Every structure is written in structure tokens, then in C-alpha cells.
Amino acid sequence: AGVIVDSEVARAAAEPVLPVRRPLPGFAAHVADAALREEPAAQRHQLTIDRGVQERLERVAKKAAARIGPKVSVAIVLARADTGAILAKAGSADYFDAARAGWIDMARVVRSPGSTLKPFIYGLAFEDGLVMQETTIEDRPANFAGYRPKNFDMEYQGDVSVRQALQLSLNVPAVRLLDTVGPVRLVARMKRGGVTPTLPEGERPGLAIGLGGVGLSLEELVQLYTGLSQRGRVARLHSRADAAAPKPPGEPILSPQAVWQITDILSGVAPPQGAPRLGIAYKTGTSYGYRDAWSVGYDGRHVIGVWVGRPDGGAVPGLTGYLAAAPILFEAFAKSGLGIAPRPRPPAGAVRLARAELPFAQRRFAPSARESADAPVEPAPEIVYPPQGARVDLGLRAGATMPLALKINGGRAPFRWLANGRPVRLSARRRTAAWTPDGAGASTLTVIDAAGRAASVNVFLE
């Protein structure tokens, strides 16, 4: 009593109460969630987030998802390439959008990266002196012990330069180079950059990893690409400003000369339709079945990564990195307000030579001895049960947990199973298996054999 005078009480009581619902604050929600999980007892959290950049990129993500379609989410990560500090991160299109599962931080979810690892394959080839930018390499049908990669458009370009092969993201040339430099070595370089790619349990890295046959998150991809911005030196991503920045990995992921060659090529990739030429270097990727669209770009100071897809792993017909993710990448760079930083000067020993100036051995890349054009191969895998379009009553609506029998013909073990784009732990050697679904509804089942060949069926489980 006596704290507030009667006149003030009367005035406050006379104020009208407006029935207005105000939106919940959702600023940098996924970053805030992570900070609270890491330091739940802390009274104050100091983050590396730049408020202005964060707000602008959250708007970019939300508008892009609405433009692309329902149930689609967008994740964007912007980081300093030299320190790894995350300046902005939208883990989804809208944290409170239940239809897009906005509460899931898609920047940390492991997905297939599509072709976004190809620059590192070419980097190893440059480092080893196997090729230069104008080296001729074949883009023709090839057989690598039963693995027959095809280009995204199912067409072949014939003889192309290494520069063209990377800019066009041709699959066969990338696999040819990976077959020579070695998939185990590629994975080792990723680990050198502080990233551990996810492989099916018990499997060794194979040629398919160059085309997306491995699991990485958007944050991990952005971390790898900091090395392309900084002459091979990778910076570990972090979002806390009130703790010591994590120590960078020791050795460079690639030599400065190899990184310069990659950046020189990727900076010449045409921007997506309607986007301005910003002077950035960038690469796109699309996962198997149109489930994930990626684009990662960088200048001399920042790296931005974009992921587009459905959080439930469902396919989005026509969703590609170039058509869906790249326009968002360019918009994010343009609207970040950070400008475009010049790239480092060419390091000593970095040269760009015409084909006629190359040593004879570097004018054409020779296929490895393991590559064959006509080696016999067993039939591709086929899912014979359940058949395409089947409706299978497992009693799920009544609360039962009956498994679904799976059977395949053809293909070569070991096999990998995916349910709605996510790995399922089943026997890798047997052609029959039993899978217990999470619930009723439509499901897409995919099997991938040792040669990277895949078969899928869409079924409805009841």
C-alpha cells in the first residue's frame, strides 16, 4: 500500500486493453536453442550473431520457402571464413511453422550433399599434378567395377576440359579423378578439415561419395568451404562469443595452389537466371531423388551455405541446387549487407596455362587401369516386395507394430536401405529384410547396391 498513488491507479485502470496477438519473438531461434542446451545454467549468452545480417537472412529464407512450395524448408548459414564465427543462421524457413517442421535445425541435420564435394576431388587431382584446368578429360559412359555413373541430364559431353567438367558438374569426369586420387583419401582430407562424414555402418568409402553417397550437414559443408576461401586453411564454425574460439585444424585441407585453381574455376560459373554477377565462387548439389538442393559460395571473407528440401526427407520433383538453392545463395550475399570481399592473390606457383602450353602428360587425363568400358555386370537391384504403389495393411492404425517384409532381386551386396530418404539399419548382405515403420502413411523405400545403383518404390502403409 502507498507504493502507487490513487490517481495513477485510476489512470492505469482507464487505459484500454487492445485485443492484439503479438507474434512470439523467434530471432535466431535455433542458435538460441543450441546456446541454452550447451550452457543451461548461464544467465547471459554472448553469441557471434550479427543482428542485422540475421534478420535479413531470416527474411530471405522465409520468402524463398513460400515461393518454392508447401512442406519445403530452407536453411542458411553465413560464417566468417577466417575465424569460423557464424554471423547468421536460419535453421529453417520459420521456427514456428509446423507445416514445414520449422523447429528442426536443418543446418545440423545430416543429408546427402550431392555434388558439393566435387571441388575437393578436383583439388586433390590438382595437388597431385594429374591435371590442370585445360587438361582434356573424357565425359563418356564408363564402368568402374560395376559402378556406372551417369550425368544428371543423362547425356554426355565427350571430350571436355577439366575446367568445363567442374563448372558443368559432370559426374563421369569427377568419378574418373576420384578413382585415381582415392575415396579414402578424400574422406581423410575432410576429417583433416574437422568434419567426419557419415557412412553406412561397416562400409569403406567408395566412388559414390563423390556424387553424394555420404552424409554431411550444412554446417559441415560451410566449414569445409572456409578452406576454399582461405588458401586451404579451414576454420571451425562456432556461434559463441563468450568462449574461446575453437582451435583450427592443423594442416590445410588442400594446398594453396590447388585451392586457387578451384576458386578460379568456380568463380567462372554463371549465376542463376535473374541473379547479378557478384564475383563469388560457388558450387551446387542435388541429392538422389530430388530430396536435397544445395548451394555453397564464398568470397575472400565469408562463406554462405544454403540447403532446400523437406525435413521429412520426402522428394520434391524438380528440386535442384541450381534452380532452388543457388538463387537463394545469391540473394543472401546481396542482402547480407556485408559486401563482396576480394579473394586472396594467387599464391606462388599458381598458373593458368593454355592446353598447348601444358606438358604432354597433362594434356589429356588417362583413365585408370581399373576402368572398363565393357566389363560384365550383374543386373541392377529391383525391389520385388512390396511392389510399386502397394497398400499394405500392417495394423498400424490399430496401434500394431508389425514389420514390413522387404525383398530384392539383382544388384550386388552390400545393400543400403533408405526409408523416406533416411538410412535404415538392415542386413547389408541379405536380399530379404524386415523394416518396422514409424507409423501409417505414404513411404518411399530405396535400396542402393555396392555399385551405387538404386531402386525405389512408393507404398502406402496402413
What are these model-predicted stretches?
Residues 280-462:
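Soluble, non-transmembrane domains of envelope/secretory-pathway proteins that act on or interact
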Residues 49, 74-75, 137-142, 153-197, ...:
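Active-site-adjacent helix/loop patches that line small-molecule binding or acyl-intermediate pockets
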Residues 4-10, 100-103, 126-144, 181-188, ...:
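Short, well-structured active-site flanking segments
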Residues 57, 84, 105-137, 165, ...:
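Active-site SXXK
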Residues 47-68, 76-80, 89, 97-106, ...:
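A penicillin-recognizing enzyme superfamily signal
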Residues 33, 79-95, 126-130, 142, ...:
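Glycine-rich, acidic and aromatic/proline-enriched surface loops and short helix-turn segments
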Residues 1-51, 55, 150, 191-202, ...:
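Non-catalytic, structured segments within soluble enzyme domains
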Residues 22-37, 131-186, 245-268:
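Conserved catalytic neighborhood of penicillin-recognizing serine enzymes
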